[in-house]
């Protein structure tokens, strides 16, 4: 079945999350060491499920302060500019090809400001951009998915494809809801069961264009 809608994880799937964070830390004089990226991701995941809701800028700041004992001002600046991190080179052209087949919607654990930054880096707007700041939930909370379905006026099912490099944040829940899942094998991805597996978004463009 061809997709009627594609939703995308952004950080780690479209945006090169690790490279962006590594470069930001290097500019602050604190190179990222082995194992620290995963530790930061895991701490962010825990903070995202706490209440009251915090925006992603604050989540990033707290995770850097707690995991790396990082300076508060630098950590806040890194969180503010996360949407300016580089996109994967294959992303812009591939997403344009995919958007010719079906709407492409960001479904991202980030802030609205990061969406403005990231779409500027892509060079165009996606069909819609729905972020944690909009719904006051973070993936993998199923309530995020329910709110996305409500906003888009769609029912979960195989015509809705969800695309991510992360099983734990995205694909496991998407599968449980009956969506078609696509795993993108990015560096530092977290693999898991998926209906389709591609090396990059060019591979996805080829898949949906068949």
Predicted regions and their residues:
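N-terminal helical cap/lid subdomain that shapes the substrate entry/recognition surface
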Residues: 2-89, 93
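Asp-based, Mg2+/Mn2+-dependent phosphohydrolase catalytic module
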Residues: 1-6, 18, 72, 92, ...
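Short glycine/Trp-rich loop-beta-loop segment that forms part of the substrate-binding cleft
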Residues: 99
